Structures are given as C-alpha cells and as structure tokens.
Amino acid sequence: MRHWQWLLVSLVALGGSGCAGYKLGPVNGLTPREKSVQVIPFDNQTLEPRLTDAVTSQLRKQLQRDGTYQLASHNDGDIVVSGSVTHYVRQEVSFSSSDILTVRDYRLELSAQVTARERSTGKVILDQVVIGTTLIRVTTDLTSTERQALPLLAADLAKNVTALLAEGGW
C-alpha cells in the first residue's frame, strides 16, 4: 500500500511541475484587453493595387481574434499601429514536369515596415519589417489566382504583426 502512495505522490508532483511554466493569456505581462490598439491604414509603396486594404483589414481581424488588445476605432487607442507595404514579390517555386519553363507554383511574399507607438508618450514599441508569405498554384489566369490569394497573404502578415505586438518582444 505504501508503494502505491509514493507512486501517486510522484505522479502528481511530476504532472504539476510540467505545467509550472505555463501562463494563461497574454505573455507580455498585460491583462487581456487592458490596452487598446488603433490601426491606421497602411501606405502602399508597391505597384500592386489593393494590398493595403487587405493588410489593414486582416490586421484588425487578427488583433480582435488574438484578444490581447482591444481594437480602438475612433482615435482613442493606447497604441497606434501604422505602416507601409514596401515589397510584393512573386517567386517561382516549382515547374511543370512536362515543360521546365512553365511555372506550376509561386511563392508570394509581402513585406511591410510596421511601427507601433504609445499614444500618450510617443514611445516607439515596434519598428521593423514584417513579412507574410503564401503559396499559389498557377491556373489559366495568374492575375485571378493572385487576387484570390491576397487575403491569405495579408492574413499571414497580420498574424506575424499581431504576434510581435502580443508577445512584447520589442
């Protein structure tokens, strides 16, 4: 009987120590939704149209989904996020097996210079280039395929920006 008690105590101690470092909620020390974020529409420095609308929209959605910050919409956010879309690149990933000059898949990459400032102090808490990527399979109409992939590309960029803001690794 004594052997089972020690085994049970050991299992409970081992199980409890496995969860010792886990933290529920935001990992940057904030209480969830304690601060609010205002997202200013991004500037487009590329020749590709409609990028900034998708990026701004997806960033707002991702911030709401994450829950670390409350989304502010009327110039009253504690943190103001702004940025510029700086690069849009389409790179060949794979080619058709029957014709080595025909591209089968592209990797789309979107880069943005993102800045986050505290409204009250003006202190810059994030200022770096963030990249989002996605893969597309070429169909008969490359332009339509790229247009359909734009929300996915913007969502990946928004996810990366939100992670930088929420985790507080500035």
Outline where the language-model segments fall.
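Generic marker of residues within folded, mature protein domains
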Residues: 2, 9, 29, 73, ...
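Soluble non-cytosolic domains of exported or imported proteins
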Residues: 45-57, 103, 107, 143-156
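A structural "domain/chain start" motif
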Residues: 18-61, 68, 73, 120, ...
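C-terminal/domain-edge helix-coil "capping" segments
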Residues: 20, 118-126, 133-170
